[in-house]
Amino acid sequence: MSGSFWKFGQDFGSQSPLAKLLNRAFIKIDDKPTSTEAGKIDSNSTDESLESNSFKSEDEEEEYELPNREEDYKAYKPNLSLLNDLLDDEELYTELMCSNFKLLVYLKYPEVLSKLIDYVRNSTILESNIDRVTSEDRDLVRGEDKDTTEDFENAKADKKNIDGTFEEKERTRSGEEEELENEENDSASEDTRVTLPHELEEHDDTRRARIAAEILSADVWPISSALIENEGLLAKLWSILRLPSPLSIEASTYFMKINERLLDMNMDGIIEFILKKEHIVDDFLAHIDNPPLMDFLLKVISTDKPEISNGVIQLFKKQNLVPKLIHLLDPVFDSCTQSAAGDFLKALVTISGNCPNEITSSIGPNELTRQLVSPNMMKQLMDIMLKGGNSLNNGVGIIIELIRKNNSDYDTIQTNYTTIESHPPTDRDPIYLGYLVKMFSEHMADFNKILTEKKIPLLQTSYGTIEPLGFERFKICELIAELLHCSNMTLLNEPSAYDIVRERDAERERIFNSQNYVDSNDRSELKENEDDNTGDADDEVEDDTNQVESANTSIDGEEVIDKLNSLQIETNKVNQNMNNEEQHSLMPDFNNGDFKDEEDENPFEPQYSDVILDSSDIEKNFRVSPNVGDQLKISLQDTRVIDTMLEMFFHFQWNNFLHNVVYDVVQQIFNGPLKIGYNRFLLDDLLINIRLTDMIINGNNECIEYEKGHDTRLGYMGHLTLIAEEVTKFTAYIEEMNITFENTEVMSSLFESKWIAYTEDVLEDLKEKYNAILGDIAEEGDMLQDEEEDAVYDKGERTMGTVDDYINDIMQMDNVRCQEEEEDEGEGYVSFDEDEPQEYRNGDSVRSKESNSSEGKRDQEQLYYEYVNEDGTKTRLNFNPDSDATEQVPGEVNRDHKIPLKLKRSFTDACKSETIPNNTVNAKEESVFQFSNELSDGWESSPSNSIPKRASPSKNGMNSPMFQHQFELHSPTDEFGGHKDEILSAEGHDYDIDEYDELSDDSDEEYDNCEDEDSLDYADSAAYALCRSKSKDKISWDEEEQARLMGVVKFNSEHYRD
């Protein structure tokens, strides 16, 4: 591959600089050359080649020709002194991706891979700034380059000396040409080397480190496989994590690229190596603010899938990954470290959600997130958040992500419907958020204190001096809104759910501890057995040794069983103690109250009456032993947090983020359950104590006064209107469902006269403005009226009609313009089928040969259309039939058919190929359609002359229009609508059938009167079919339609004549 793209001035047959380097990159183990003589040619072999009168180059190739099989390279070792030259060659990576055999073999040597890792771990790369290279490092780099350059120059000098000797002996012209060729190759080799100015020489190791990282992370199986199989090389690479922080972004990026490649190629091998590291968590957390390293750590965690667990999550749990991350949120650390720890925890929660199909890397609930929501971790996180500052912001983000990604309503198996026997607890059980909600319920007063007492200096803006809300207060409001969402989850409102989850957690912990105990005993027994086997190796009696080992094994097994039983007994005791402590706590557990025996007054039972029981006695029963969801709602009411948030809503008039959060809280309360849970009492408090309706009215009045002085509305008015609409929707709901409250003050607040006046006047006007269409409606309406009045058609000016008539006229005018454009484009493209048995007749057209003078006189007075079927029968359509005329053409049947209004819906597909049924109509029967003057909706059509022709399906070589339609005749005596005669092929019309369906005024009557409903679905948007149904309507065609059809006949007679 090295000769595929050669340099200018070089022969294609000459070797590339990289190929020359690779020829000298291997040293035979038997030769043992020194570092300075690695590239030299043996003088004895040169003398022999001179005596044999052969070319030097051929002798070198024969003597130093490298093997073609990889197994033969075991007798060679790499020439490490050429590695710098290889890395400086610009074609190295290209040749590597092209699978250069010699290059792959050279790079697979452990010595070469170790050297490449040294380049990645170079001190210059590990430092965060390249300019901080010490003089010693600079001298070291220059010294290595100097040694490599001297070796290369010595090799070239020896080569030139040999060439000179050869020239003196031979004096041939071929020798001189060979010398020139070698000199050109040497100069080309020097030119292709990547050289830098003198002041940038210290960047050579940076460039080589980048190339080394690209080689180690390349998609080349031999290199990756050789790296994974050598655990010493992996340990050397991972030693980067042991270096002090901060680690440069270049070094961490190289580390991530290389290990991601190895992880994708051989996941089991890398995971096995990771599981052996005892301090991997500490190594990564030492560089917590290094994004590439933390991203790689998250990817390692995502490899532990629910269906195939590899033990990574258990390893990180043992090494306390989550507690250490929470500790890093403390304000004692700098803000960058806090933010990095918070971001990693949020990313961990994201991939651990209970909806595994949301993202590709999702691993579902696991022990790490379960440890995160445990009571101890929540208590630690709560204490850190109450310190305020950046810790509060990061903590709120973690809590919100936990709630959003672990909604118990989406769990596949609901925990409250399971038992330990039916569903034994596993490490992949859903995450229970009850501990989290319970902890925040107990500390809600502390968060409310931050809301009310936090003071921030005033801020000068273009609108004047304002008081900023502050990020802490906004985050607390956002947290409260999310906790209210969480408290409405079904599992958190089940009285027995808390006890069930605690029991499952205790059982899960017991199983986990027992497994660890058994594993530790197995490992200790294995070591003891190994020691026993070593100590008894010199024993002469083997049978006695086996008996002793079997006895020891049985004794150890009994001890393990006894210890497991004792562990289970201790666990049960611990559970009992925990239950007893919970029963005597300030917030008692569920199902522990006197109201259990009073089934008639159980507030947790859903109410099926129309009266909402919200009396003070019911509220007291709820407070005796509330469930987790109700605990949060009670804390919200007791701390008056919602009242504080509403006051902030009107105080911070321009903070739309706060307005959106407050609206979310109010919306949840009004849309929450009324007959179960404590939500009804929050609603009562919102309407009675807080007086939400009065706050809305006062806020609107304040906005009106502000608008008079500043000519602009206050910033909260948009969300205030939304809150008012929630109140009106709730009022409409209770009226529709005939719901009343036991507390009469609720209904009184909803039906106060001032609130009714506000909703009927102010709120309706606001809603009308919000729903108005943008633009000048009056001007647009006048323009539409003028266009409707000026609409003119073929027969003169039409009188004012309905809106549907106007839209129909506009559609027809557009279709006329489209058809005229098609005529201009398709001029000269139309041909006519000469063999088609059709004749188009008009008052001025040519008569058929069978017509006589009497028929000619009648044709001048009467317009009709006549054609001949394949079976020899004739069919005539009279456009203006004379009601008194009784004369008939011999052999024809002349009947007056009434065309129903259903004609608009009877369209056929113009793009379908024409098929003429055989013997579907009586050969002696001919139908003549008579059009009357009663149809009000005329068609505007213009025949198109741009219809492409195709051969008829029935006659090969016959030209006929490609786009056709048929006027379908339905026999009046056909009860089933199955006899049709497709009689006419004409040009297509570009009408939208869906639009005609929408404009139809009597679609229901048409469907009812239609004999065959399938005919309505047979239509398509490209053509029409005149249909006859059993409809008894008296509507007939008017003069406008007659004139239009006359135009069609005249056009066809002029363009499709023989």
Curated annotation (Swiss-Prot):
Compositionally biased region (Basic and acidic residues): 135-146, 153-175, 190-202, 838-861, 967-991
Miscellaneous notes: Present with 11200 molecules/cell in log phase SD medium.
Biased composition (Polar residues): 42-55, 934-963
Post-translation changes: Hyperphosphorylated in the absence of SIT4.
Family the UniProt entry places it in: Belongs to the SAPS family.
Any GO BP: G1/S transition of mitotic cell cycle
Disordered: region residues: 34-71, 135-202, 513-556, 818-862, 873-892, 934-992
GO molecular function: protein phosphatase binding; protein phosphatase regulator activity
InterPro entries for this protein: SAPS
Keyword terms, alphabetized: Cell cycle, Isopeptide bond, Ubl conjugation
Compositional bias ranges of the Acidic residues kind: 176-189, 528-546, 820-837
Main function: Associates with the SIT4 phosphatase in a cell cycle dependent manner. May be directly or indirectly involved in SIT4-dependent functions in budding and in normal G1 cyclin expression.
Cross-link (Glycyl lysine isopeptide (Lys-Gly) (interchain with G-Cter in ubiquitin)): 20
Gene this chain is encoded by: SAP185
Name of the featured protein: SIT4-associating protein SAP185
Entry's Gene Ontology cellular component terms: cytosol; mitochondrion; nucleus
Pfam families per the UniProt record, alphabetical: SAPS (PF04499)
Species name: Saccharomyces cerevisiae (strain ATCC 204508 / S288c)
